[in-house]
A protein has these predicted regions:
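A general "terminal functional-core" signal
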Residues: 53-273
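N-terminal low-complexity, Ser/Thr- and acidic-residue-enriched intrinsically disordered segments
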Residues: 1-52
Length: 273
């Protein structure tokens, strides 16, 4: 089984001012991780039919009119296809590059360099193709995944949604959790997610990975590439334990090209084992 890496040439061109140039070293950077079990795939365009199962028609029209969202269809499409191929057994796991983010996109709003909610679209597609299932989502971007939280509630998905952000919160059903990175060690928070996920029993795991938490980034909370490697190892082991290794890593926030290159390639190497 191979690791899939989803990418589209448009992601390396300028789109959102913060995200647009960070992938300037790609796709040539993939040459640094030549591996027999690595498969580079071009992210397809997501269908409007699927988008309209998650977002309103007005939302779609507003995204179409926003020139900064030009990469949104391929960004979301890569995540949708990755999840389908991993769950269907064509790939062991996957890493998805994006040109426009997803976790700040709700039912009828978008902000913060996000356009369509890629992970929620992927879950909706899994439900359509394979039936309802339990899904776990961990968000280690510097900012709260408010759009994802709203949508998993509205759409009544069976999702454990765990955000490591700046506040502490646990919903009544125990499935929507925010953990403040000020209140405990970061890796301890990741381990707590693993404990909850083992109890929950997901069939697939999504990791929304933002390198905006890195030292010197706009969401700097003191993390380094070594921390990202440790998190990747923890989540890979969790996936192997609870869902036959089915793990999708979705790139989130971050702006510095050197950090984008080093951190994403490091995480891909962990996925390759």
């Amino acid at each position: 089984m191979v690791t899939g890496v989803f990418y589209h040439p448009s992601f390396s061109r300028r789109s959102y001012l913060t995200l647009g140039t960070r992938l300037k070293d790609f796709p040539s950077a993939f040459e640094e991780i030549r591996h027999p079990k690595l498969r580079i795939l071009e992210s397809p365009r997501v269908s409007d039919e699927l988008i309209l199962k998650v977002h309103t028609p007005r939302h779609v029209e507003e995204v179409k009119s926003d020139s900064l969202c030009s990469t949104a269809w391929h960004s979301a499409g890569g995540v949708v296809k990755a999840a389908e191929m991993v769950y269907g057994g064509e790939l062991r796991n996957a890493f998805c590059y994006i040109g426009a983010g997803g976790h700040h996109a709700g039912r009828d709003y978008f902000w913060g360099y996000c356009c369509f909610n890629d992970v929620v679209l992927a879950v909706q597609n899994l439900y359509d193709e394979f039936g309802r299932m339990k899904v776990a989502v961990i968000d280690t971007d510097a900012h709260h995944g408010d759009g994802t939280r709203q949508l998993v509630d509205l759409l009544d998905f069976q999702v454990l949604h765990y955000c490591i952000c700046s506040t502490d919160y646990v919903s009544k059903d125990g499935l929507k959790i925010d953990v403040s990175y000020f209140s405990q060690d970061y890796l301890d928070a990741v381990e707590e997610f693993c404990e909850r996920a083992e109890t929950f029993g997901p069939e697939i795991i999504f990791w929304y990975f933002g390198h905006d938490t890195h030292v010197g980034e706009y969401g700097d909370i003191g993390l380094t590439v070594k921390d990202y490697i440790d998190i990747a190892k923890i989540l890979r082991e969790l996936a192997e334990k609870v869902c036959e290794g089915k793990l999708i890593v979705v790139l989130g926030g971050g702006s510095i090209p050197e950090i984008a290159k080093e951190s994403t390639l490091a995480v891909i190497r962990v996925l390759l084992g």
